[in-house]
A protein has these predicted regions:
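Repetitive helical segments and hydrophobic/amphipathic motifs
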Residues: 11-12
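Sec/Tat signal peptide C-region and signal peptidase I cleavage site
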Residues: 16-20
């Protein structure tokens, strides 16, 4: 019994750095996503999604597929800017997936501009060694 407890602790210690690395890697991807969005590059944003990805926008219809996702973001880029996303937590999902919880802040392009905030949950999957968004859902804080 004691041996099992020691093994469990050792495996837990080994997993902690891997999760920290995953969180840092996912945050880097979120930074790339926000940079592309803030530049108005809908094609670059859409390229971060898997071909069969789903986006479930708050208060809008669900979209599926990279082309539909690009159209959605192109529309939203006209109204929003200054996007900053923060990864709060990452959980592994098998060998090639990760679940992420985070928050985003943004500014509207209306006059006068208004600040906004939202929370999101996404599922990432590895395709050809690269992380791609598979499911993206969010809702507004207010």
């Amino acid at each position: 019994m004691r041996r099992i407890a020691i093994l469990a602790v050792c495996f837990g210690l080994l997993a902690a750095p891997a999760l920290a690395q995953s969180k840092a890697a996912i945050q880097k991807l979120e930074d790339q996503w926000a940079a592309a969005f803030n530049k108005g590059d809908a094609a670059a944003v859409a390229a971060m999604y898997a071909e069969d990805a789903y986006v479930l926008p708050a208060g809008d219809a669900m979209v599926k597929g990279r082309a539909a996702i690009e159209a959605l973001w192109k529309k939203d880029m006209g109204a929003l800017g200054g996007v900053k996303c923060t990864t709060l937590d990452v959980k592994p999902l098998g060998r090639s997936g990760a679940g992420e919880i985070g928050t985003c802040t943004f500014k509207t392009k209306a006059q006068p501009p208004q600040d906004g905030a939202l929370k999101y949950a996404v599922v990432w999957k590895k395709e050809g060694g690269q992380w791609k968004l598979l499911v993206d859902i969010w809702n507004m804080d207010k």
